[in-house]
Curated annotation (Swiss-Prot):
Signal peptide: none
Pathway given in the UniProt record: tRNA modification
Any one Gene Ontology cellular component term annotated for this protein: cytoplasm
Superkingdom of origin: Bacteria
Cofactor, free-text remark: Binds 1 [4Fe-4S] cluster per subunit. The cluster is chelated by three Cys residues, the fourth Fe has a free coordination site that may bind a sulfur atom transferred from the persulfide of IscS.
HAMAP family: TtcA
Protein name (Swiss-Prot/TrEMBL): tRNA-cytidine(32) 2-sulfurtransferase
Purpose: Catalyzes the ATP-dependent 2-thiolation of cytidine in position 32 of tRNA, to form 2-thiocytidine (s(2)C32). The sulfur atoms are provided by the cysteine/cysteine desulfurase (IscS) system.
Sequence positions that bind [4Fe-4S] cluster: 132, 135, 223
Catalysed reactions, semicolon-separated: cytidine(32) in tRNA + S-sulfanyl-L-cysteinyl-[cysteine desulfurase] + AH2 + ATP = 2-thiocytidine(32) in tRNA + L-cysteinyl-[cysteine desulfurase] + A + AMP + diphosphate + H(+)
PANTHER family hit by this protein: AMINOTRAN_5 DOMAIN-CONTAINING PROTEIN, SULFURTRANSFERASE-RELATED
Length: 300
């Protein structure tokens, strides 16, 4: 039976708190629950009878994700179960007791997968290079295998609004493509459905909530400490935009849900040759339109 995490309680404070300060954590929790519930409803993330696997890393995002889903589970319009799963990648100095202790105290069903991906990544990736990509692939493979073996129907990840927007700019700047993170998707092999219930949640709100709830945060010493990573650079850019023009990142996030293919230039999404009649006429060879082409030189 899946246990329910109690509502956040006011944190102990040696100094008297004003009514406004006492209410703020409750307002934040309510705002987060509303955003998560809205995302679940908008994208049909959870269906009746789903077994949702919450991928728990020990960071603020995955703690908040688990907390929100446990709270929403009590009032959700459909029944679903939750299991928290952590992949112990055998990183040096990883505090292996932190997550089990926390999850047992909260009476949350959980499993710990032990797989030494750290040694693989350290052996394959040259020193000083970014480990994130290979680490992510190995982690994803282990979690997918667990989901397949345990009848999991939805895999919940802790990516938030800022992650999604940052991924959009990563693809734009470094791969010349318009792509981000889908709030809900089917894995490449078609076997798993991945959901991101924090898709509408700001990272700043998650950080404030994690601090208020005093989650036992586990830092990532494998990839998070590497400097000058492209994602960190994009993150700083977005933070600066938000400081200089509040609301800009919100606008970008909303734009990702309002795509106009006919106003872009992707020929696989829009029939440009079919515009203006003559759609059935054969198109001339492209070389005929190229200035300085071999065909032009042949005529000369």
């Amino acid at each position: 039976m899946t246990a329910v995490l109690p509502l956040p309680l006011p944190l102990a404070d040696p100094a008297p708190r004003t009514p406004r300060l006492q209410r703020e954590p409750l307002r934040l929790a309510k705002r987060l629950r509303h955003a998560v519930g809205q995302a679940i409803a908008d994208f049909g993330m959870i269906a009746p009878g789903d077994k949702v696997m919450v991928c728990l890393s020990g960071g603020k995002d995955s703690y908040t994700l688990l907390d929100m889903l446990l709270q929403l589970q009590r009032s959700a319009p459909v029944p679903f179960t939750l299991v928290a799963v952590n992949l112990d990648q055998k990183q040096p100095d990883f505090p292996a007791d932190v997550l089990p202790t926390y999850l047992r105290a909260q009476q949350v069903p959980f499993d710990i997968i032990e797989q030494d991906t750290y040694s693989v990544v350290s052996r394959v990736i040259p020193q000083g290079k970014t480990m994130c990509s290979l680490c992510s692939r190995l982690r994803r493979g282990a979690l997918y295998a667990y989901a397949q073996a345990h009848g999991v129907t939805k895999i919940a990840l802790g990516h938030h609004r800022d992650d999604i927007v940052a991924t959009f700019f990563m693809n734009l700047f470094h791969h010349a493509r318009l792509a981000a993170m889908a709030p809900k998707l089917r894995s490449d092999d078609g076997a798993h459905v991945v959901i991101r219930p924090l898709a509408y949640v700001r990272e700043a709100d998650i950080a404030a909530y994690a601090q208020a709830r005093q989650f036992p945060i586990i830092p990532c010493n494998l990839c998070g400490s590497q400097e000058n990573l492209q994602r960190q650079q994009v993150g700083r850019m977005l933070q600066q935009w938000d400081r200089e023009q509040p609301g800009r990142v919100d606008q970008i996030a909303r734009a990702l849900g309002d795509v106009r293919p006919e106003q872009l230039a992707d020929r696989t999404l829009f029939d440009f040759p079919g515009l203006g009649g003559g759609a059935d006429a054969p198109l001339p060879d492209a070389a005929g339109w190229l200035a300085g082409s071999a065909a032009e030189h042949a005529r000369d």
